Swiss-Prot record:
Pathway: Cell wall biogenesis; peptidoglycan biosynthesis. It catalyses: UDP-N-acetyl-alpha-D-muramate + NADP(+) = UDP-N-acetyl-3-O-(1-carboxyvinyl)-alpha-D-glucosamine + NADPH + H(+). It comes from Prochlorococcus marinus (strain SARG / CCMP1375 / SS120). Its main location: cytoplasm. This is UDP-N-acetylenolpyruvoylglucosamine reductase.
Length: 294
């Protein structure tokens, strides 16, 4: 009998911030750690592939969809905090901007940069998301993860997670984040931390195209360079491929103008890479996770 939170033939476009992608053969939406363990076990018993969707940012799903089980973590949210010690534990599906606001109201310093990141705690940990010179690894103590292959659960400390720019051991080993522990700095006033948080949010709203569907930043920044600046200097703002467009607001964003497909996005990424390589001699590396492509 099917787990009640696993459903067949579900459209995935609405679960991504690009609003793009085909169907999942199966879709699981766990609400707690026990349910995700059951869903991974369900997939393992049937020998089918298991893919994770967090907030759906930084994600491109094939127009033809995904074979196997897609697990969307959005319903698996919640957190506990101690405003005396600054210890915060959040479930993987907790939206990062929500957590940033909640801890700010408790006078906890350390996540102000995260208020404009359109992702979940789990997704941010997997790719070591960051902004304004800070990143997820800065305040992380440990992550509880599950292996989809073995079903084993581990708590991995920060030093063993091999964090680097937009990389982690979790990403390399294809582990699934269940929850994350952070150590934030207590003792600040709510007003002070909220003010800093709001300044970061307003900066992002002024400089990034939040009014249109996008995945967030498309390319990793090369060493000591900004991908957006490189693309802008080549005059590529506004470049279109089908319904996909290089944002006129920030060149490291590709926006969906209403009817973009994964094929449009893929082709536009390729065009940008070729133009940058021709001019600068290196290939910009996407930070977008691709699902359903072979």
């Amino acid at each position: 009998m099917l787990n009640t939170n696993i459903k067949p033939s579900k459209k995935l476009a609405k679960l991504t911030t690009w609003k793009i992608g085909g169907q999942a053969e199966w879709l699981g939406e766990p609400e707690n750690i026990q349910e995700i363990i059951q869903q991974i076990s369900w997939a393992k018993e049937r020998n089918i592939n298991c893919e994770i969707i967090g907030a759906g940012s930084n994600l491109l799903i094939n127009d033809n969809g995904i074979q196997g089980l897609a697990i969307c973590m959005r319903k698996m949210h919640g957190y506990e905090l101690n405003n005396r010690t600054g210890i915060v534990e959040a479930l993987a599906g907790e939206p990062l901007p929500n957590l940033a606001r909640k801890v700010a109201r408790e006078g906890l310093h350390g996540l102000e940069w995260a208020v404009g990141i359109p992702g979940t705690v789990g997704g941010a940990t997997v790719m070591n998301a960051g902004a304004q010179g800070s990143c997820t690894a800065d305040r992380l103590i440990s992550a509880k993860v599950i292996s989809p292959k073995s079903g084993n659960i581990y708590e991995i400390k920060k030093k063993e997670l091999e964090f680097s720019y937009r990389q982690s051991l979790i990403q390399k080993e294809k582990l699934i984040v269940l929850s994350v522990r952070f150590h934030l700095e207590p003792g600040h006033s709510e007003e002070e931390v909220l003010n800093s948080t709001n300044i970061n949010l307003h900066h992002r709203l002024k400089t990034q195209p939040y009014h249109l569907p996008s995945c967030g930043s498309v390319f990793r920044n090369p060493a000591n360079l900004k991908a957006g600046q490189i693309i802008e200097e080549l005059g590529l703002k506004g470049l279109r491929e089908g319904g996909a467009e290089v944002s006129t607001m920030h060149a490291n964003f590709i926006v969906n103008k209403g009817d973009a497909t994964a094929k449009d996005i893929t082709q536009l990424i390729s065009i940008i890479q070729k133009k940058v390589e021709k001019k600068h001699g290196f290939i910009l590396q996407p930070e977008v996770k691709r699902l359903g492509f072979h």
